[in-house]
Amino acid sequence: MNTMGILRRLSELGDVFTKKEAQEKLGMSTKQLNYYLEALLREGFLRRVTKGIYTLSLEPGRTSSPHEFVLGQLLVPNGAVAYWSALNYYGMTEQIPRTVFIQTPVKKDYRKLLIVDGKRFKVIVVSPEKFFGISTIRLGRREVRITDPEKTIVDCLDKPKYCGGIIEVLKALKNARLDYEKLLEYAERMKSKAVLKRLGFLSGRLGLGIEKEIRLSEGDRKSFALLDPSMPPEGRFNYRWGLRINVPDDYWEEVE
């Protein structure tokens, strides 16, 4: 098969693919595959985005940059778009994060920040028990995993620093259409009292009613978590929820 025949076969994978996918598609040896990939790179039909990932165009020199979510899926095959990136995708925040946040239960030596094809990726490794509530969306020919809206909120309650702070969670709770029963179920499934405390406090502040279903023991209330762990440990104590409200009083003005 000549290089143009190989190109047509590869185009069936879409405009971005991995070397592993190409080998499975073409059914050839690594040596043969490397030969054709290098030939197509020289002719301008392919562009190497990073090790093992290529973009393709049927017009030489016209390869495009893949969608950041698609690239994130290829970089972290066992992951899902999450936190601030998922908040933005669902329209739960007007903020546009400069970094794509990917959650994965698979421990690997990921760098703190990956920069690939001019895009920034932050990989957050969580325990397998916290990796649930995953949906699938289609972008071009690719399916991409993303946390569903309720899991996105719960993850942001768990790690507010990956969503722009607790204020972004408050905005999302106020403006988004959410299944509150599922939201509470997910919060309980996280096995984190801090998540339940933050959810209860914010729900009470917005009058959502979720707070009425949250049960905390006296011991839970005497062990104080920070409302926003991304901010300094200061501020008044809330004994109803066992929280230290470490945000200024005018913090809520733009929302309420």
Where do the protein language model's features map onto the residues?
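Short beta-edge/loop segments at beta->alpha junctions of small alpha/beta modules
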Residues: 1-78, 177-193
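Phosphate-binding glycine-rich loops and adjacent basic patches that engage nucleotide phosphates
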Residues: 1-3, 30, 43-52, 112-119, ...
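N-proximal short alpha-helices
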Residues: 6, 13, 56-59, 122-127, ...
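Short gly/ser-rich loop at a beta-strand->alpha-helix junction or flexible surface loop bordering the NTP-binding
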Residues: 19, 38, 43, 48-61, ...
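A residue-level signal for conserved active-site and pocket-lining positions in enzyme catalytic cores
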Residues: 22, 86, 153
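Residue-level marker of positions within ordered structural domains that often coincide
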Residues: 27, 91-92, 158, 204
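Hydrophobic alpha-helical interaction segments
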Residues: 134-256
